[in-house]
Amino acid sequence: MADTTLAGKADSEADPPRRSGRLAGFLHRSETARGYLLISPTLAIMTVGIIMPFLILLVLSFWTRQGFGFDTTPTFNNYIRVWTEPIFGALLQRSFWISGIATVATVLLCYPMAYFVAFHVHRNKMLWIILMTLPFWTSYLLRIFAWKVILGYEGVINSGFMAMGWIQAPLEFLLYSQTAVIITLAHAWAAFAILPLYVSLEKIDKSLLEAATDLGDGPVARFLRVTLPLSMPGVIAACFLIFIPTTGDYVTPALLGGPDGAMIGNFIQLQFGAVNNWPMGATLSIVLMLWIAAIALVFLFLTRRAQARIT
Amino acid sequence: MTDTDALISIRKVKKAFGSFQAIEEVSMDIGRGEFFSLLGPSGCGKTTLLRMLAGFENTTEGEIFIDGHAMSDVPPHHRPVNMVFQSYAIFPHLNVRDNIAYGLRKRNLSRAERYEMVDEMLDLIKLPGYGTRRANELSGGQRQRIALARALILRPKVLLLDEPLGALDKQLREQMQLELRALQRQVGITFVFVTHDQEEALTLSDRIAVMSGGRVLQVDTPERLYERPVSRAVAAFIGNMNFFRGTVRRNGSASGLVETEGLGNIPLPLDRLTRPDGAPVQVALRPEKFTLSRTRPEGALAVAGRLSNAAYLGERSHYYVSIDGCATPVAVSSPNLGVGRGLAPPTPEDGPLWLSWSPDAVVLLDAD
């Protein structure tokens, strides 16, 4: 041991360590600089691909349509219209309602699946997770059409129930309705719920569950006092991952929603397409974003409160 | 120990995991208010036995009684025992106070009563004022105490401890050992303590069960385990031991001795021989039971040998002395009393050294 240190010392005297360049030296000293360097590709894409379009959208929302062009005088007219005309509020409300129900349904259905894999599967956990995401290997559009086949007027469910003699006429609320949109969304986004739920459940130290049992909790109390609070980050992540994109979804409602199932996304798409009122579309997008942010904040606040209450 | 004193009775308990027999067949009693340790190398079944007491594992065969009640059908959350986990299992989403009060939920206490009990416990574990700290702000030693408080606040009949000091550094561990012992005397609850550290078990326990390969080898007080082990496995597991082959020689009913390879003939009272004439035995002697001298001591059992190795350990030194008739050198541990007192440290150049011992220190074991 003593020999090697002596040898090392002799070496360094003979050959002093190479000094690095100024930039490398700066990066070596500053952790923040290194961090920015690391995220710079992402940062560039974010700036060009998200922040720029967002700024354009923001500017556009204060313009108004004039024939086939824009009146570029800044005005709040679009926002005032969105606030006063009931159609916008109704559409927003319906969008939040549909995606809210879809979110709750997805999380409730996926929690037991994630729980099962996290606590009761001991071998090949990854295989189980991959199997659960298997349906998502096909295109979104294909899955929507698959649901069309299942829910349709002469689809799998209706013809099956008729053959069984459980119903006389096909159930009409299944397809081209809000129900169809909710079912399809819940299925389409299941993978986005299972993964964060699984990760947060898997992370829970099993000895905490034993400790809760040891301290007198039965299975239900233990779940409510330990498992659920500790998996809350996963639940919140799953809710956000599903709620935010589904509110703005327009493919599913367009294909399965029918007249009652149209959501704000369809309306925004119309503004940028057939109606050709880009400023109005931009305004609606901004309003939707603000609403989602507000709902997310309220949701976060409520879960914090609930967590404090449970424990 | 009579049956009426026993708080825990383990009766012919076996445990198998698939084809692996974790516990062969264990029967023992643990007394009320005892500090009882399960000691053994890892994989010996001590933790499995503890987890069966807690109810986290079922017994494959046999029955465990706690305070006279059979435990087979009692789920863990209804047993009158609480556990301190090896990892402490402090709830990360709760602060110290809520961690300690966790088990009080079913007791129908007001919030003020619960907090008062928690404050009492915090005083007991010497962490007053820590109630609102978050779990991630605690050191290992503090977590350990809080895990202890969380179990003790429920006043269990038995407190189970699964290597609770294993994760602490040496100094803190020694301090916690003393505190744990004092705490146990103070609260008077029966402690069942699992450890693989023999020194820890000897320091803390009223009685120790030495386990190996799913069996209990010996249940005894620390002193008897050390001075009178019943098998070579126990003797070798606790402390160091020199072993010599020997044969029992009885001279009618008057006197007896053991012929040994290396130590010569050792006369022993007949009641300690307990074996028939001609029986092969092992003679065991602890390193510190030997006295080293440069001349043959008067009137003591002694053999001559040569020093083959020495290690200085501060308060004492270890010497390895080769003697005729013995393949491995005899380990001798001798206190370093200082310059001018006792024997000056011998060196290999010193020539022959004399090893002497008292027959009282000799342990007779079955030959293997």
Name each model feature, range by range:
Chain A
Residues P41-A44, V48-I51, I130, L134, ...:
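Transmembrane alpha-helices
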